[in-house]
Amino acid sequence: MQHTKIAIIGAGAVGSTTAYALMLRNLAAEIILVDINDLRCKGEMLDLSDTLSFSVSSSINMGTAQDVRNADIIIFSAGIPQKPGQSRLELFTTNKKVVQTVFKELQPISPTTIIIMVTNPVDSLTLLAQNINGLPRTQIFGTGTLLDSLRLQGLIARALGVAEQSIDAYVLGEHGDSQFVAWSCAHIAGTPIASFADMTQEKLATLEQATRQKAMDIIACKGATYYGIAACVSLMCESIIFNQKRVLPLSTYHENLGVCLSLPVALGERGIEKTIPLKLAAHEESMLYRSVERIKAV
């Protein structure tokens, strides 16, 4: 993509940190922040503009939904964070209205725009965004379990004393309570992770639980997570802009399942290029279908 224009809808902690990550990685020629809170949006824009000397970005501005209809990439991070004790259905009901309102204002949207959904519950809201837009489903997808997978890889790396980049392991399914690790497909240089002497079934279960718990630990300490997800979104944008076709676990639509959930996909300049087939163990297949039912229940 030439002269990439990236719009970020929702200039809160996640959106503004994502803009910062994009600028430091020199991924956008133009970044536009959109938020219902004009004062907050202006403050973030002015603060971020101080980093332009360290970036090739030609500009960072604030605008409206109408200003970003022709953006190459739209990152959707607007919405209300989940409150303690709030059900996923309640959260979906709240953020559904935000998604519907914003996408109505975005019409007519450029037929080549790619939309990255970040707002939770991301699987259900990604499907909603697909259903209310005229774009191909391959151009609208969510961050899904990408951050969960990177957290898992970090934990495995520290346990085995290898680089995180050398680990091929994914968290799949719902971005939520029913997510699971596909241990049967996890390996390092072709060697199954489960075959390492240190990786007992108890250790694998501990790593999986630590992966699931990490977000809650962060929220308990500081109220929200945003650095990790911002880094994930910038990685996704890089794969799109440079047509890298990176294989990432993202929330995409699977016609045979009828929902959006995370499986490994190749991400390029046209969006989702293909889903990478996995040969899951029987119990992992069962966990995948449990995720499907959980998502459908929202």
Region locations from a protein language model:
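N-terminal Rossmann-fold NAD(P) dinucleotide-binding loop
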Residues: 15-16
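Aromatic pocket-lining residues of Rossmann-like dinucleotide-binding sites
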Residues: 22
